[in-house]
Amino acid sequence: MEPWYRVATPRKEVREGRSFNPDEFAIHLEQVVAKNAPEDYREPKQFFARTCWTRALRDHAGMVLRRLSGETANTAPVLTLITQFGGGKTHTLTALYHLVTTGAKASEYQGVGDLLKEAGIRAVPEARVAAFVGNAWDPKDGRETPWIDIARQLAGDKGVNELGPAARTTPPGTESLARVFKAAGGPVLLLFDEVLNFLNRHRGMADQFHAFIQNLTVATTGTTRGAAVISLPRSQVEMTDWDMQWQDKITKVVRRVAKDLIANDETEISEVVRRRLFEDIGSDRIRKSVAKTYAAWCFERRAQLPPEWTAVDSAATEAKAREYLRSRFEVCYPFHPATLSVFQRKWQALSQYQQTRGTLASGVDPTASPHKWQRPSVGYIIPATFGYAHWDADGQLVLGWINEVPDQEACETSESGT
């Protein structure tokens, strides 16, 4: 059996070990907008080449594009993006930004053509975009308040004038915001990220910002070609009572008119990780052969193996159960399904674990240096010999070796048995 590292080819930066800290995989929306983000995130073509179009991302983007195209069915004027820490919310916001700032040309990018067919629209609508990133926003001349900044992004000085002179101290009402949208001269998309971080840093503006968001959601509802996407954290990691109070207030205001979206479907994490870490996962023939061999071996020994290895529905027929297990091994390749299961079952319970981003960072070392962690005959990246990441420069998550004895014994037997 071919070992995985002779079949799959990691990306160049992974082979060189350049990406290790979770921050290496983090997207900063404000940098994308300012055109000073790393090239993989800054350039739309490269960004979409590395984007996994998960079901969640296709649904989110499709709803927004339909709304901006003037469609009202199967969409909403305000969307809340619910996500685990490091779970893909900024990737979704960045995808939306690149789509609507590129417009019709975006159909040339990987996956966008299929997205348009699924959404039932002919082309990507070009829109004026205002992005508010709370952990990067501070007042300065020309953007004394968040609403002045947003008005300027949408319609320049004309947009700011529509707010009136009181905007320097008072949040605008729905009519003023409607005038700003009109001044933009076309579809408008509003992207909000890290709102709670902004409130925490500018507590004196909390009540004003709360009123602004309330009026903004109402004004957006009154448009036919406008949408607002607001990211809200699912977890309450390191939140103070004040943080939780304001998160609850903002959430209640937004959800009066918003549709909730979940940023990353956990069942598709494997494809996200594969797309980001590997430039090629080898021939279909080899992958299918390895998956079939492993799945057959595990199915015959399913009573002795940990349940997360097989996840077989006892109510299914034997043929369906075998096929499900085979497809699971094939979809996860070159990662053993149990490897990804460790992240989803156990690590997510850790308060500082960053879901997709943490999985990516942890997968770099064994992917870049397979001979260090794997035996020559191993067909998959398996959990028992997986050297997990340890990043501690800022006192962040520090994890050593994970060595699950039942999994290790099963893997050892699997190697000799297959």
Residue locations for each model-derived region?
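Walker A/P-loop-proximal flanking segment of P-loop NTPase domains
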Residues: 1-87, 94, 99-100, 249, ...
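Extended alpha-helical interface modules used as scaffolds for assembling large macromolecular complexes
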Residues: 1-42, 119, 132-137, 177-178, ...
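Conserved P-loop NTPase mechanochemical-coupling segment
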Residues: 40-50, 127-171, 196-204
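Flexible phosphate/Mg2+-sensing switch loops adjacent to catalytic phosphate-binding sites
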Residues: 75-78, 97-133, 160-171, 232, ...
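ATP-binding Walker
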Residues: 87-88, 106
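Conserved P-loop NTPase catalytic core
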Residues: 118, 125-140, 144, 218-222, ...
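Mid-core helix/loop region of P-loop NTP-binding domains shared across ATPases and GTPases
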Residues: 160-192, 203, 210-219, 223
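Conserved ATPase-coupling elements of RecA-like P-loop NTPase cores
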Residues: 198-209, 239-242
